From Swiss-Prot:
Lineage, uppermost ranks: Bacteria, Bacillati, Actinomycetota, Actinomycetes, Mycobacteriales
Annotated ranges, domain YcaO: 116-439
Name of the protein in question: Uncharacterized protein MT1419
UniProt-listed Pfam families: YcaO (PF02624)
Amino acid sequence: MTGRRLARFPAFRAGVAQDDDVGSTLSQGSTTGVLSGPNWSYWPSRVLGSADPTTIAHRHGTHRITSPDETWLALQPFLAPAGITGVADVTWLDCLGIPTVQAVRPASLTLSVSQGKAASYRAAQVSAVMESLEGWHAENVTADLWSATARDLEADLTYDPAQLRHRPGSLYHAGVKLDWMVATTLLTGRRTWVPWTAVLVNVATRDCWEPPMFEMDTTGLASGNCYDEATLHALYEVMERHSVAAAVAGETMFEVPTDDVAGSDSAHLVEMIRDAGDDVDLARIDVWDGYYCFAAELTSATLEVTFGGFGLHHDPNVALSRAITEAAQSRITAISGAREDLPSAIYHRFGRVHTYAKARKTSLRLNRARPTPWRVPDVDSLPELVASAATAVANRSGTEPLAVVCDFADACVPVVKVLAPGLVLSSASPMRTPLQEAE
């Protein structure tokens, strides 16, 4: 099957095209779609709390339709049904003081402990619980259509499934029978289909062999107070992973100097790290117009291990905060030993801590980034933000991105999986050389 390629999308506001020459429709072969945004009517309506699901009303460290306090209250009835037995503050397992929280779900079919980080403790609590709920939903999603081939669904598919991320040795072809989930395109709101195994995240052992097909990972899996909020977070993660894959020192990746960070809302996070005797190197990855992506690398004077984090957002302050707090969270994750998927190499290096040798900083020499414009105009419309990000992804990949609601009988919060067929993604640090990673 030949994938349908999209022409470049016009920028549009609140679902209406602004380019008069293009109009308000897109043509893909025999398919015409109206620029209307995602269509959530295929799934039950879900909104946490009573906030307006179309408007950003909270802008302190993150952009949400409601505050972390209100989200925290709305989440309480769902903890027990999801199997979350505890929420623990692990901030001071490390010396940095950046709020980090764990949510424990012992019966998980993936990771039993999820971590959340933020610039405030309440936001970190919400982050941890929401990540755990994301996992619970992705573990239990059910298919909507059974045993059909891509050829059977060709009239309804808006993309080529061969463009999805495949497992090594994948046996996928257009004639193989798969189970499918309903999806919506994010710009035109058309119904399409996504392979169930491209959404499912479940590592439970089964008593039968299954041919390798699609990559099982959580890239693009996100929750929120409403579907649009979750979708925006998922799109930003997909765009972040593409930025990491496309980062080239001196071309798209540049050093962020200390004097530039001083003008950001995250200056205090850098001060906390340095007050603890550690250091953080920052880079800006300029891949997406109108979006800011940062990479952070945390080093310690007494620990031969580096830890990294990334963040992408339309507000550079939020992007930088996410990168720094993710780096701090990754170190606490290793210290606590809480994740089942931690590589043993981390602890081999931890075993050398008695040497008190400082981790080698990146050997890459980056040019200084131009000053970051830390004050950018606020955008209140959540649908507009989703449309802008989806347009950017579609223009880069040539294919309209998709969203699947992770739905099942006990689903309780808005959780979506966003897929961007044809977009190259990576989570490997572009600030480390292969030699350094092997050491």
